[in-house]
């Protein structure tokens, strides 16, 4: 039969999970329609998990990319370097290699712990045969602010390339060195390569991890706000961007009324007349950074990141459907493998005449 979709899977529940309060959540395939061989895209799957159908495959927003094998399920063995400390890290190659070693050891531990465990055979086989690890980063936006670089300007793009080319360089050295000492991953050995790990880099969202790391920025995205109220299990506290606070202090403007105005403007500093243009650009919030700048930086990094990036974007209220299409098309043209989350604009004040998604700080391309 020439069919698209899982015709035998009707009524099957997918993504079924049991939560700590013993509640159950799942998505169920209600109906399937055969349409022959033509491409089919249905983004109307009834789910709060952003699932949709693409050529019969139940699809979701994608965090990272690995090759698909019928008899293996990819294993996520990942960690991240905190780029707030990049100046120390870049001059210490062994630190980067140790991070890769840490992940390879975790993969080995996973192999040992899953031996004989029911339903883990496919994942264990992937860990044995591919030994994929993913070293990424967090704190990129904070690093830019520490150095006074605006998101997407020439300086930020230069250090962005330096970061990921350096991590890739020492990651390649590590996986080849350890491959010679301890043996290559079987899938690499079959291909005639000396590599301990088939893949070595990916950039996760790192939202929770970045907060634990002294509330630094996430994987690739700018700060959502320069000031916000953070609610934890037992406490609430007000976060103020420490680098902005330092700048305000140097200008004698680190005052309660200034912070009140920042709060009233959804964490933005664009209304502060005593800041110059460069300073305002440095402390732009996520919704104030044009998608083009974020995509360009991610594209520069993608050349070195084999498993992809969790790339989030903000779509402003004044963007049309054509704008959103052009953003996705531009990301594809810039070799971005996937996009992760789409956030709505933080405030309507960004609906400025003449300001479009491809407005950028430094349009070098």
Question: Which residues does each PLM region occupy?
Answer:
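Conserved active-site and cofactor/substrate-binding residues in soluble primary-metabolism enzymes
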Residues: 73-76, 90-101, 128-138, 158, ...
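Function-dense linear segments that define catalytic or interfacial modules
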Residues: 62-127, 137-143, 147, 216-217, ...
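Internal maturation/activation junctions in enzymes
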Residues: 96-124, 128, 132, 147-206, ...
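Hydrophobic, well-ordered secondary-structure elements that form the walls
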Residues: 15, 43, 78, 140, ...
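Short helix/loop capping segments that flank catalytic or ligand/cofactor-binding pockets
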Residues: 49-55, 60-61, 73, 86-87, ...
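Structured core elements
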Residues: 39-44, 52, 77, 82, ...
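HINT superfamily self-processing domains
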Residues: 1-61
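Catalytic alpha/beta core of large soluble enzyme barrels
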Residues: 33, 107-109, 113-115, 201-365
């Amino acid at each position: 039969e020439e069919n698209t979709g899982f015709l035998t899977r009707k009524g099957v529940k997918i993504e079924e999970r049991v939560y700590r309060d013993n509640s159950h959540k799942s998505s169920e395939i209600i109906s399937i329609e055969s349409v022959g061989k033509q491409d089919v895209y249905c983004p109307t799957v009834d789910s709060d998990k952003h699932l949709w159908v693409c050529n019969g495959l139940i699809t979701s927003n994608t965090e990272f990319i690995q090759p698909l094998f019928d008899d293996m399920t990819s294993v996520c063995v990942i960690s991240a370097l905190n780029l707030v400390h990049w100046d120390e890290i870049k001059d210490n190659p062994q630190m980067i290699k140790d991070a890769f070693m840490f992940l390879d050891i975790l993969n080995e531990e996973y192999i040992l712990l899953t031996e004989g465990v029911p339903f883990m055979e496919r994942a264990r086989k992937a860990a044995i045969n591919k030994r994929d690890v993913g070293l990424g980063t967090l704190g990129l936006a904070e690093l830019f602010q520490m150095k006074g670089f605006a998101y997407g300007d020439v300086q930020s793009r230069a250090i962005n390339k330096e970061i990921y080319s350096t991590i890739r360089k020492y990651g390649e050295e590590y996986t080849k060195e350890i491959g010679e000492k301890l043996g290559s991953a079987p899938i690499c050995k079959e291909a005639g390569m000396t590599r301990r790990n088939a893949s070595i880099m990916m950039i996760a969202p790192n939202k929770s991890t970045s907060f634990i790391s002294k509330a630094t920025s996430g994987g690739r995205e700018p700060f959502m706000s320069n000031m916000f109220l953070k609610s934890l299990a037992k406490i609430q506290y007000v976060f103020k961007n420490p680098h902005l606070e330092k700048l305000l202090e140097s200008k004698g403007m680190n005052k309660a009324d200034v912070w009140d105005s920042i709060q009233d403007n959804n964490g933005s500093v664009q209304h502060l007349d005593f800041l110059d243009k460069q300073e305002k650009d440095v402390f732009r919030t996520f919704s104030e950074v044009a998608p083009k700048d974020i995509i360009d930086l991610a594209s520069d990094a993608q050349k070195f990141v084999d498993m992809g990036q969790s790339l989030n974007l903000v779509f402003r209220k004044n963007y049309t459907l054509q704008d959103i299409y052009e953003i996705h098309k531009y990301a594809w043209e810039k070799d971005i493998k996937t996009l992760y989350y789409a956030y709505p604009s933080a405030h309507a004040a960004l609906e400025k005449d003449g300001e479009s998604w491809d407005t950028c700080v430094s349009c070098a391309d």
